[in-house]
Structure formats: structure tokens, C-alpha cells
A protein has these predicted regions:
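Bacterial N-terminal signal peptides that target proteins for export
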Residues: 1-12
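Alpha-helical interaction segments
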Residues: 4, 46, 125, 223-224, ...
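Compositionally biased, intrinsically disordered low-complexity regions
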Residues: 5-7, 106, 554, 737
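Intrinsically disordered, low-complexity Ser/Thr/Pro-rich tracts
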Residues: 7-8, 426, 660, 666
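Beta-propeller folds
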Residues: 10-13, 19-470, 478-479, 487-489, ...
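Serine-hydrolase catalytic core recognition
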Residues: 63, 229, 252-254, 307, ...
Length: 777
């Protein structure tokens, strides 16, 4: 689950008569004071540009990949108002950039087409770009592997040629170069295939895969909740493939029909809900035998070798969390208990399939998954491992048997693993020079680049400028690509040569925002305090008291308060309409240690909301310009849930809410996410009841606008329908705004613009305009 913005608008009169219960006869809301809605029209010109430029990210380099020798950097970039990415290359020595390939050159006048499976996979990965969504470099850096409209292409950097690869018919997903660069593997119609680049012969390495029992594809919860988006892996010598078999025969099937397009077939999905059956997963190993390519070309029905199945205690550890087969290291898998309170790292013998435990992690609440580890050293002597067992994330060096060699990054150093670092935590490992590069910060509103010595654990900080820093390192450790955004700076990207510090900017064609947000990041409240972001109007008048809009997420895995200009562009536009916008990272959000995060265990319905209220009151004590008698709240996904919960449980604080794609009943969300925090429904019925919006529906006493995409395949549209139905039956006045044909990731620029406009009109109506009051600070 993830907070994502973007919604749409329909005529309000339509919802007065629709069957969703958009308007329900009930007693009028009783505000303490009548605040007349502002009559001024909403200027959406900035919003239109914001959406057309993808929040001013279009035109900025993305998916940066240094060549193995560090001589060049390849990257994707679109035009300033386009979602379509093309491929570029920066020469580090000369600083010159050249265009390598555009989608138009490949498609030659035809339109890009995505299969339903590819659309769903991109949804899981939160990829919204068109054209080239990503690419891969061959191990020697000469070839570039790309997909477009479900077809595979190889671009040769040496001669500029583009070749379409002859693959079988069907839906093609997840292509990868083999480590020796001779083959490309991929999933085709639920089975794993390999293409020989020298002969262009294709061979199936698995058979019998179907939509019900698939080979090589990660199951839904692995993609959505474990950050594992692949279901097959090459061996380091390119002679074997390990693949996942996902058996969905006992999993519930949910359908996503599009009422806006009744002639279109429903999209079905295996969707495991709390307490119900999960996908059954097992791992098999199959050989990649060059002699079979010619034989199978002659007889496409020829049998494939029977997989060597890897046994482990699947009853105790049903989740396959991580699979690693690094150069120099053994095949290693991380399996997890359904409770997510225990997981074991297993070493696999690829000749017998037998497993040996390397280490076990336990936590009374839950264990976070870090997809950066284990990271095996190339000499096979040991691996990197991260843990929170001492209360904060730490990085360890362990030997090949799993025994601790030394603590590389102590809990006090602010290490930010992948689940807390908005991306990778381990950025690069330079074994030749003996360094591990990583992200971290003692301040959770920032991320910085560090390096630690593998030999003595000495840590040094690389970046100093306030903001969010990230990097991608070349294979030889000679160069890294540094991306940075700050409180007054949109994302910038540079190639940095480590030996001499030579820094070359990757050129951007992006438009720049017309303003810098006024956002103030403060720490406030009792005890450890809460990080808050406060955005005032650019024409702020200290002698006025402003209605407040809380822009909320407040759930696991997401921080709203960060030192990055791009995070507050929409908040600034909202503030300029006559509001002060506040975001609060309370307990349960990442970046502040195990105990801070684990307080959520057992219930979503209490602590996150308490912390929003506590922080608001603390802000009001020092910022009298905040009119806490007029507070609205809005959010998306978990934030939408929090917005609805706020007006249902605390109408004394929150006077109106816009709830986007809210989870209404946690028994209708997926297993891995929900059970991590709430446990099984049979073991924690009180927690599920306490966390359900349906429990509080009869208590609604404030204006509520529910917004939801009708084709949402993450938080299904049924959540909005259930909540509206409960409110309707309780006689509670509310509004529902369905976003026709949209999923959980709403990408339509017009819809997103109109939704923000509708949100402002809603809050103007129910919160009013700034009023004279006591002087502010």
C-alpha cells in the first residue's frame, strides 16, 4: 500500500441520484460557527502544468545505469510535458550526451500496447511512464535490452543497431540477461524461456505453467507487499535457473470489472485476504543446456528436464521473501512465517536441493523485509546482513556459515534499509577498495550518502547538503550517479568519478516549478516529538487565522515529512487557496526505530489518529495562525483510511474529510500487509473491529467525500461501496466520487486536476476562508 495522488471529478448532481448513496437524507451538519464558502473561482492553471509535467519530474533523467567500466551513464528521459521515455547516454570524460533510441524509432508509426499482465505488473511497481519503462545493460555494457509493446529489443551501443528478438507468441514479462551475456531469459505465458543471442533460438525451461499454477512469476503479495517483483533467477555461471511455482488453486479470485466500459471483460486476480488461503509457493532449479536449443526448435513439444525442487518447512515458513544467487555466493533464500514474527535464511545446495540454516530472525511484533540482503561477497567468504534486533537498523558482516564477523553499521548510525530509505539502502559494494556505500541519516527527514570500511567499520559521510540523496554505482566502483533534491531544489543528477572527483551533470529538459514552497519542517510535541511539515500561503498574512488541511498518510512504510521541495508543490497550491497545510509523521511511520514503528501492532484505529491530534494541538500552541476550530483532513490509500477515520472518531477536531481510496474493512485487504500489523482475524477480532471504518459509520457527524477508482486492484472499489452502504443505512449524509476506469494509481492528468479542484471547493464550503484573529508569530 502506498500514498499516491491523483483523482477526478464528475458533476455533483449526478451523484445525487446515483446508486452509490452519494447524498443521503440526514440531519444537516452542525458546525460551531457558520463559515460561508469562498466565492472565488479555483485557478487550476498551476495544477494543469503540475499534472502535465508529472509534478515537474518529466524531463529529468531517471533509471540511471553506469556502464560496468564507469566510462558512461545510460538513462531514460522524456520531454517536459510527455510521459514517454527515450534512451540517452552521457560520456563522462567529455560531458557530452547523445540520444540512443526513441520509442518512435522502434514502433515506426504504430501505437504502444501493453498487455493486462504488464499493466498489472507496472501497477505493482508504481511505474507510470510510457515508452521505455526500464532497460538492462549486458554484463560487458555493449548491449541494451528493452521491451516495448510486449516485444524484446536489443540495442548495440557500438554500432547503433536495434534488433527485434524472435520470441514466441504470448504475454512476455521480466526479461533478464544471463550473467555471461549469452542468453536472455523471460516469462512467456506463465513459463520460463531462454533465448540464445548467437543463434536466436528459443527454448522453454519450464512447461505446464498456467494462470492458476504459474512458473517464474512473483505472486501478488510478493510484488505488492514484499517488494519482490521477480519470480525467477539466473545462476552466476548462467547454466541454471531457479524459478518460483505459484499455485493459486486455493486462493480466492476477485474480479475487477469496469462499469465505465461494460463491454470489456473483467480483470481477475488471485487476492488472498486475512485469515484465508495464500498462494502456495515452491522453488525449482532447472538446467540451461545449449544442446537443447536445436532439439526443441525441431520439436516444440519436447520434454523439459524435471525441476529439482527445493524443500523447506513450508508449513512453518509459507512466504518466500527473498532469493539471492550472487557471484561467488551460494543460492540463498529467505523464508518467512505467516505471522511475520520469524524468518530463516537458508543456504541451498543446487545439486541436491537440500537447505542449511544460516541464521534466524525473530520479533514479537513483526519483521521488516530488506531486499538488499543477503549480499554475498564475490569471494564467497561471507555476506552483508541487516537487522533491527537492537532497536534500530544495523548492517552486519557475517561469514559463510552465518556467524557474525563484525558490526559494520551500528544502530546509532542512522542506517536506512530498503524498507525505510525510499529505495535501496546498500548502494554499492566495492570489494577491491574495501567499502560499502549506503544511505542513512540521524534525521529521518533526510537521507545522505555514506561509506563504511569492510576492514575496520570506519564510517564517513559523503554528502552534506540538506535533503534527499541517492546513488547508483558502477560495477568496478570507479563512478557513481548521484541524485539530490532539497527544500529549495528539485531533483538534480550528476555523474561523479571517485578517483578525481570529476562531476558531470546529467542534462535535464524539465520545466521548473514557478515557486519554492514555503514549507517549514519542525519537530514538535511531547517526549520524542513528531516531525511536521507546515505550508503557509505565499501571500500569508500574520493577522489572519487560516483553516487547516491535514494532508495525511500516518501509516507503515511511508514518511510524509521530508526535506524535499517536490514533496510540497501540491500542498503549496492548496495553501494558496486560503489554507495552511499540515503533515505529521506520528508513531508507526518509519525512520525512528523499532519501538516507534511497532506500536501499531494489533490496531490501526487508535495511535495513528491520536498522534495527528496531539501534533495539531502542539502546533496550535506555537502557531496561532492555525485555526484549530476549522480543520479538514485528506489522504490517499492508508491516508484515505485515516481521513475517514478522523471525521468518524474525532469530529471534535476534524470538521471535514476527503478520503481517497480508503481501506474500509481490513478483512478485505491482502494477507501479507494486514496480518503483519493486525495478526489473524480469528486471533485478534477486537483489533480488526477497532480498525474498521464500518464500526464507526453510524457516528458520522461531519462532511465526508469518498473518492475511489472503479478499477482499483489494490484497494478494491468494494471498500468505497461498503462504507457508503453502511453510511446510507445509518442515515448519514456523505458524498461519493467514483473515478471512472481508474486504478489505485490515477494517472489521467485531467482527472487529477479536477479532483484537486473538487477538494478545494469541498473544503472551502465546509471550512470557510481565512478570518481576522490574533497576531501570529
Amino acid at each position: 500500500m502506498q500514498r499516491l495522488r491523483g483523482l477526478a471529478v464528475c458533476m455533483l448532481g449526478f451523484f445525487a441520484v446515483c446508486l452509490l448513496g452519494a447524498w443521503v437524507a440526514a440531519e444537516p451538519f452542525a458546525l460551531q460557527e457558520p463559515f460561508p464558502p469562498a466565492k472565488l473561482p479555483v485557478d487550476t492553471s498551476f495544477l494543469k502544468e503540475l499534472m502535465e509535467t508529472r509534478s515537474y519530474q518529466a524531463g529529468r533523467p531517471t533509471n540511471t545505469q553506469p556502464t560496468p567500466d564507469g566510462s558512461a551513464v545510460l538513462f531514460l528521459r522524456s520531454e517536459p510535458r510527455s510521459p514517454t521515455n527515450a534512451l540517452y547516454e552521457l560520456n563522462v570524460e567529455t560531458g557530452q550526451t547523445r540520444s540512443l533510441l526513441t520509442p518512435a524509432q522502434v514502433l515506426q508509426g504504430t501505437e504502444e500496447e501493453l498487455s493486462p499482465e504488464e499493466k498489472a505488473r507496472r501497477e505493482r511497481m508504481r511505474v507510470t511512464a510510457r515508452g521505455f519503462a526500464n532497460f538492462q545493460l549486458s554484463p560487458d555494457g555493449r548491449l541494451v535490452l528493452l521491451t516495448l509493446s510486449g516485444k524484446l529489443y536489443v540495442f548495440d551501443r557500438n554500432n547503433g543497431s536495434i534488433k527485434s528478438l524472435p520470441t514466441g507468441k504470448g504475454t512476455l514479462l521480466d526479461p533478464k540477461f544471463s550473467p555471461d551475456g549469452k542468453y536472455i531469459g523471460y516469462v512467456l505465458d506463465h513459463d520460463v524461456y531462454v533465448l540464445d543471442l548467437a543463434t536466436l533460438r528459443e527454448v522453454a525451461v519450464t512447461r505446464g505453467g498456467t494462470e492458476v499454477v504459474s512458473h517464474g512469476l512473483a505472486e501478488f503479495v510478493a510484488q505488492e507487499e514484499m517488494d519482490r517483483h521477480t519470480g525467477w533467477w539466473w545462476s552466476p555461471d548462467s547454466r541454471s535457473i531457479v524459478f518460483e511455482e505459484a499455485d493459486n488453486r486455493e486462493v480466492e479470485v476477485w474480479s475487477v470489472a469496469d462499469p465505465f466500459r461494460p463491454g470489456r471483460s473483467a480483470f481477475t486476480q488471485y487476492y488472498p485476504r486475512p485469515g484465508k488461503n495464500n498462494t502456495k509457493v515452491r522453488l525449482g532449479i532447472v538446467p540451461v543446456d545449449p544442446e537443447r536449443f536445436a532439439a526443441q526448435e525441431a520439436d516444440s513439444t519436447a520434454k523439459v528436464p524435471e525441476p529439482l525442487w527445493i524443500p523447506w518447512d513450508m508449513e512453518k515458513y509459507p512466504y518466500l521473501a527473498t532469493v539471492k544467487w550472487d557471484k561467488g555466493g551460494p543460492l540463498t533464500i529467505l523464508v518467512q512465517a505467516r505471522s511475520q514474527q520469524e524468518m530463516v535464511l537458508l543456504r541451498v545446495d543446487p545439486t541436491t536441493g537440500q537447505t542449511t540454516p544460516l541464521l534466524t530472525e525473530k520479533d514479537d511484533a513483526w519483521l521488516n523485509l530488506d531486499q538488499d540482503v543477503p549480499h554475498w561477497l564475490e569471494d564467497g567468504s561471507g555476506f552483508l546482513w541487516s537487522s533491527e534486533r537492537e532497536g534500530h537498523p544495523q548492517l552486519e558482516l557475517r561469514d559463510a556459515s552465518g556467524k557474525l564477523v563484525r558490526l559494520l553499521i551500528p544502530p546509532s548510525a542512522g542506517y536506512q534499509p530498503s524498507y525505510a530509505a525510499r529505495g535501496k539502502g546498500i548502494l554499492g559494494v566495492d570489494e577491491k577498495r574495501g567499502f560499502v556505500y549506503f544511505r542513512g541519516s540521524e534525521d529521518p527527514t533526510q537521507t545522505h550518502l555514506y561509506r563504511v570500511s569492510l576492514r575496520d567499520g570506519n564510517i564517513s559521510r559523503i554528502t552534506q547538503q540538506t535533503g534527499l540523496h541517492s546513488a547508483v554505482f558502477s560495477k568496478d566502483g570507479s563512478l557513481y550517479v548521484h541524485s539530490f533534491s532539497g527544500p529549495k531544489t528539485m531533483r538534480r543528477t550528476f555523474a561523479v568519478r571517485i578517483e578525481d572527483g570529476k562531476t558531470v551533470p546529467l542534462p535535464s529538459t524539465a520545466l521548473e516549478p514557478p515557486f519554492v514552497p514555503t514549507t517549514e519542517v519542525v519537530k514538535i510535541g511531547p517526549d520524542a516529538g513528531f516531525w511536521c511539515a507546515v505550508t503557509r500561503p505565499r501571500q500569508f498574512q500574520p493577522r489572519l487565522r487560516y483553516p487547516v488541511i491535514v494532508d495525511v498518510y500516518a501509516g507503515p512504510g511511508v514518511q510524509r515529512v521530508v526535506e524535499s521541495m517536490g514533496s510540497y508543490l501540491t500542498a503549496q497550491w492548496i495553501a494558496d487557496q486560503g489554507f495552511i497545510v499540515v503533515s505529521v509523521d506520528g508513531r508507526g511511520t518509519p525512520g525512528r526505530g523499532r519501538d516507534w514503528e511497532r506500536v501499531l501492532r494489533g490496531s490501526f484505529g487508535v495511535i495513528p489518529l491520536e498522534d495527528q491530534v496531539t501534533a495539531l494541538k502542539a502546533l496550535g500552541q506555537v502557531m496561532p495562525e492555525l485555526d484549530l476550530e476549522r480543520v479538514g483532513i485528506t489522504g490517499w490509500s492508508f491516508g484515505g483510511y485515516m481521513a475517514a477515520l478522523a471525521v468518524l472518531k474525532r469530529p471534535d477536531v476534524f470538521r471535514a474529510a476527503v478520503a481517497g481510496a480508503p481501506v474500509c474493512d481490513w478483512q478485505d485487504y491482502d494477507t501479507h500487509y494486514t496480518e503483519r500489523y493486525l495478526g489473524l482475524p480469528s486471533e485478534n477480532p477486537k483489533g480488526y473491529e477497532e480498525s474498521s471504518l464500518l464500526t464507526y459509520a453510524p457516528k458520522l457527524a461531519r462532511p465526508l467525500l469518498i473518492v475511489h477508482g472503479t478499477r482499483d486492484d489494490n484497494v478494491y472499489f468494494v471498500h468505497a461501496l461498503k462504507l457508503s452502504d453502511a453510511l446510507f443505512r445509518a442515515g448519514k449524509h456523505h458524498e461519493v466520487l467514483p473515478l471512472a476506469g481508474q486504478t489505485h494509481v490515477v494517472t489521467d492528468p485531467q482527472m487529477r486536476t479536477r479532483l484537486q479542484e473538487r477538494t478545494i471547493l469541498f473544503f472551502r464550503e465546509h471550512l470557510g476562508s481565512p478570518l481576522p484573529g490574533p497576531a501570529a508569530r
